[in-house]
Amino acid sequence: MNGTWSKVAVIGAFVAAATTVRGQEGPPAVPLDAPAAKVSVPSGLKLLRQEVLEETQPDGTLWLRLRYVAPEMTRDNRPGMQADFETLCESEALTYEPVTRVPAAQAVISIATAPVKFGTTAPDIPQFFEAFRLEDGTCIWEAF
């Protein structure tokens, strides 16, 4: 009987290790130097896709977190970046195919001057965020 419980414990440990944290099911991050990571925006800033995260909310809706890096961006760029966020929503969020196969209801787009681990603060790295509701194939800006 002891041997059986040991096997169950080992199998359980492997299953737990292979299971992702809820809300972190998205595809692996694209390396910043990969051609697929480069994104064009109206402002002309050079953007690199850091990652796309899928986050299931408590109500069951799916949020996308599209995270980009723009090494040349400064705080002074912010006023001219609204069209960049809209373009990213239309060209990236609306066309993204979630791993979960649940249509995304919200897209939170962030642009930072350097990669920042999701969920951490980095006061020395400028970051800008915009949120959009994804509805009927359109991006609807959400003030937050």
Residue ranges and their predicted role:
Residues 2, 23-61, 72-73, 143:
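N-proximal, solvent-exposed amphipathic alpha-helical segments enriched in charged/polar residues
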Residues 5, 20-21:
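N-terminal compositionally biased, intrinsically disordered segments and leader/signal-like regions
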Residues 61-108:
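Mature extracytoplasmic domains of secretory-pathway proteins
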Residues 9-17:
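Bacterial N-terminal signal peptides
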Residues 102-144:
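Polar/charged, Gly/Pro-rich intrinsically disordered segments
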Residues 1-10:
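Bacterial N-terminal signal peptides that target proteins for export
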